[in-house]
Amino acid sequence: MASGYGDASQKIDYVFKVVLIGDSAVGKSQILARFARNEFSLDSKATIGVEFQTRTLAIQHKSVKAQIWDTAGQERYRAVTSAYYRGAVGAMLVYDITKRQTFDHIPRWLEELRAHADRNIVIMLIGNKTDLEDQRAVPTEDAKEFAQKEGLFFLETSAMEATNLEDAFLTVLTEIFNIVNKKNLAADDNQSNGNPASLTGKKILVPGPGQVIPEKKACCSS
């Protein structure tokens, strides 16, 4: 699977919008910088304004551009709007493993996400900052149980140490890819049977029904 850092010339087969949500200071901007540019800065200032970055990857021999959106500080004013969620087919729901309150707010973020996004959006719960294990305030099992109850993927990560971030994004992007691919195949079948194919020529932003938590991803490593 190609990393695709900084490759702007290649043909793009799919574009998937993925949003990062969660309380302030849980590391969303660092997660974005690490995944999109393989960069990390401890001096990263709070994000202000709309921000998204892209990274292109190869998934099953197709070129997929991930368009990753950061809430850009709006969460501090509880001002994340429906426009932010519009068109998103994936979401990273982030909390800080050293701050219990950020995990306790996850149900509210999930409720807001499901109210504004497509009901079948692919969601990954992320417990960030595993590099601060000695300050852990959220047991892995608590998050794991919540993810299983809500039908979410789940991993613990460290943007600082680049732990599990590739796995987290690739799990979500591959799941979206598989859903869209199935819809395209179904559309082709309908067309061959003389029925109109609503997805003909459209390869982006169409999630499908539900997602299953693979056993290998429904756990964490720190």
UniProtKB/Swiss-Prot annotation:
Gene3D superfamilies: P-loop containing nucleotide triphosphate hydrolases. It is found in: Cell membrane. It is a lipid-anchor. A motif (Effector region) lies at residues 44-52. InterPro entries: P-loop_NTPase, Rab_GTPases_membrane_traffic, Small_GTP-bd, Small_GTPase. A lipid is attached at C219, C220 (S-geranylgeranyl cysteine). GO terms for molecular function: GTP binding; GTPase activity. It holds the Pfam family Ras. GTP binds at residues 22-29, 70-74, 128-131. CDD domains: Rab11_like. Belongs to the small GTPase superfamily. Rab family. This is Ras-related protein Rab11D. It comes from Nicotiana tabacum.
